[in-house]
Structure formats: structure tokens, C-alpha cells
Design a protein with these regions (language model features):
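C-terminal non-catalytic regions of proteins with extracellular/luminal or membrane-system context
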Residues: 1-17, 29, 58-237
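Metal- or metallocofactor-binding catalytic centers and their adjacent structured scaffolds
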Residues: 52, 56
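A broad, low-specificity signal for short, low-complexity segments enriched in glycine/proline
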Residues: 46-50, 182-185
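Conserved, charged catalytic cores of large soluble enzymes
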Residues: 25, 29-32, 36-49
């Protein structure tokens, strides 16, 4: 409702109209410099040849690899041996493509994005990997923690992928103001990105409960965070 309130602020004298004019001019100037007034639309044929070129994919992979930060490696558990017999891959971010991507990412083909689970299966094999979601990022009604515990007990090591999400629901409808219309009974994973503020740095939903339950199994536990904003990691450390 920011735009509606902005109109009220101008009408009531709380906001000077020149402030808005200045902000609008910046946007229009940039569009002019980019030639968007003369050529507002992209040529689909040119776009198809430009987007996802080999060198772009290689650069994106390099950036993603460089962004990974190892915070702790207790007992030198990493790197894992390729001879390991069974790995449990658990967590709401272990096999969710859009949760790995930033805000305003365009709709993607599944083949364009590899999840953590995809990568582990590639290195091992489907028969040596057991996946359970465990819980959602925010929705507390999603509870597969018991299934996750059982999978952990059957495995030699547990990789749990938690964190946050900037994933937008492309089926979401919007008000005239641009605000999303929330459907009753639905809780998206999105907790980061435009329009999302938080009062806590803790994991949301049942994620902390999932971590503590897996730790109690006594199996070696590797915790991976995929997040778009800083999250508290004191328990995991």
C-alpha cells in the first residue's frame, strides 16, 4: 500500500511533490540513456541468442562457487568421501530451485537450475542418496521431521539445507497498488526480497526444530544455509 499512502502524503502536505518529481526524473533519465523510449521491447530472437550463452553460464557457476563460505569444518568431516554408502539430504532448501535464486528472477526451466540434491546425486548415485524435505521455510503445518529422522538413522552422514527464500509465486495476483493478494491457507517460502521485513534473525517455521532433531540422531551433521539475508547461526556453530 506504499503508493496509495504516498498519494495521501502529498495531498495532506506531509510530502513535497518535488521530492517525487526528482525520483521520477532519475528513472526517466536512465530509461532515456538506455534507449527504452525509442526501443521499448527486446527482440525475442536476439534475446534467445544472448540469454544463457555458454560463457554466461560458466561465469554464473564461477560466481556461485566463489560465494560459498565454509564457516566450520569440525573433525575435518569435509570433503566427504565418494565411497560413502548412504547420505541423507534433508531440508526445505535441499531440492527447491526457486529458493536458490534471487528476487525478481524470471521463470526458469527446471533444466536451467541444479539443486543441492541434484548435485549430490550426480556425484554419488540415486541409490546412495535419500531425500526428505523435513519442513518448509515458513509454513509450520508442513511437518516431515519424523521421516527426516528415520532417513538420518539409515544414513552415514546427514546434509541438511535450511535458510530463507526470495522465491516469488508467479501465480500470485496483485492489487492496483502493486501489493500481493495473499490466499487464505497458503504460506509461501518467501521471507526475503522486496516488501519483506523481519523482526528476527532466527530460522523461521520448523527449521530449528528440524536441526535439533537431526542432531539428536548422533549422525555427522552438515548444515548448509541458502539465504538472501544474514541469519543467526549460533546454534549450528
Amino acid at each position: 500500500d506504499a503508493y496509495t499512502n504516498l498519494c495521501h502524503a502529498v495531498q495532506s502536505g506531509q510530502m513535497d511533490k518535488t521530492v517525487i518529481d526528482t525520483a521520477v526524473c532519475r528513472v526517466l533519465r536512465m530509461k532515456f540513456e538506455m534507449g527504452l523510449f525509442e526501443h521499448p521491447y527486446v527482440d525475442p530472437k536476439i534475446a534467445a541468442k544472448t540469454v544463457r550463452r555458454k560463457e554466461h553460464i560458466e561465469l554464473a557457476r564461477k560466481i556461485a562457487q566463489s560465494s560459498i563460505t565454509l564457516l566450520k569444518n569440525e573433525n575435518s568431516i569435509l570433503p566427504l568421501s565418494k565411497m560413502i554408502n548412504k547420505v541423507a539430504v534433508i531440508g526445505p532448501n535441499a531440492d527447491n530451485r526457486y529458493n536458490m535464486l534471487g528476487d525478481y528472477t524470471a521463470p526458469q526451466e527446471d533444466s536451467n537450475v541444479k539443486t543441492v540434491l541434484d548435485g549430490i546425486i550426480t556425484k554419488l548415485s540415486p541409490s546412495r542418496v535419500e531425500y526428505v524435505r523435513g519442513c518448509a521455510i515458513r509454513d509450520t503445518t508442513v511437518n516431515e521431521i519424523e521421516q527426516a529422522i528415520e532417513a538420518a538413522r539409515r544414513s552415514e552422514v546427514v546434509i541438511v539445507v535450511v535458510g530463507g527464500s526470495s522465491a516469488r509465486d508467479f501465480k500470485t495476483s496483485y492489487k492496483e497498488t502493486g501489493a500481493a493478494v495473499a490466499e487464505e491457507g497458503s504460506v509461501s517460502d518467501m521471507e526475503c526480497g522486496e516488501g519483506f521485513d523481519r523482526a528476527s534473525l532466527s530460522l523461521l517455521g520448523r527449521q530449528q526444530e528440524l536441526l535439533e532433531s537431526l542432531q539428536k540422531t548422533g549422525k555427522p551433521l552438515i548444515v548448509v544455509y541458502i539465504e538472501g539475508r544474514p541469519l543467526e547461526k549460533n546454534w549450528a556453530s
